Amino acid sequence: MVDLLRQAERLQPGLNEAIHAVVASGAFIQGPDVKMFAAELAAHEGVRHVIPCANGTDALQLAFMALGLKPGDEVIVPVFTYVATAEVIALLGLTPVLVDVDPETFLLQPEAVEAAVTPRTKAVVPVHLFGQCAPMEGLLRVAERFNLFVVEDAAQAIGATYTFSDGRTAQAGTMGHIGCTSFFPSKNLGCFGDGGALMTQDDALAALLQQMANHGQKVKYYHDTVGINSRLDTLQAAVLRVKLPHLNDFARRRQAVAAAYDAAFAAVPGVRIPVRAAESTHVFHQYTLLLDGVDRAAFQAELQSRGIPTMVYYPVPLHLQKAYARPDYPVGTFPVAEYLAQNVVSLPIHTEMEADEIQYIINTLHQILTQLPLA
């Protein structure tokens, strides 16, 4: 699905230099690269504060810890998302309230959030799924009306830009109270292991997040609040500093692959190309087709037999996962998510794809779709 080796080879001189410098310094934890990366990412994203942490899941957990929510408080999340979005909410004793997504963009919609608000609702988590922003203007309006915190899950959309109706623009993860992102190796900005970060415009929240990510201490061995151990290590920060200047180019390369796929598949029976959200750019962390009348398992098997991997994000929506099952969430509760889970499939997309590779995938997919019967 992605070729991390080829990207690393292209950036190898800078990566080698950065890694060797960290090894020579011996500053593997809280070394200078961590602060420098935070400052550089903040400048790139146009946000006051970036707080690096160990991974994207920790970023979400730290966000809810810092907001001071109490057990039993409700947090609205889309039912069609990666499990981490709801996982941290449940771990903290909060109640994830699931809502269905838009059938076109697969994103959380303001109307669905408003319908799910109760007196116990304290926050909402817009997920910028697959590389484009949720409709933040409407979601922020609903959040303001009901006095809700907004925690953006931008793990898949770093570098995506949202345009408000007045012409203002903002980066994914910078519009709510806190934005969370991941630097998992396959992400658009990925390190050589696990990594994550929080973003906020709020000075007080930034200070608290920084403290909570380091065992709740501002001064070593003096713990003012309960925290966790969630630090981005120096080696990963150094790698990310090398990659960050290429982030916009990474997006353009992915967009070029997506454009080729779009042109090839837009009029093909049995598949629907990704629908772009009107207010957001799309950085294509995933290129996800929606199959219509095509046997997905057979489709994937045929592609795999020809050397083309595919993935399903996500095969089981949250309400049908054992860990999040509830009596009031039976099969059929969220029909859009259930349909998507049965019919989406993602094609290879990454920064190092060559024209002949893209064309091979296009030609092969065309051949398979002419052979597979449509329901």
What is the predicted role of each segment?
Residues 174-210, 217, 237:
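Active-site PLP attachment segment
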Residues 10, 72, 254:
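Pyridoxal 5′-phosphate
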Residues 65-161:
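PLP-dependent aminotransferase-like
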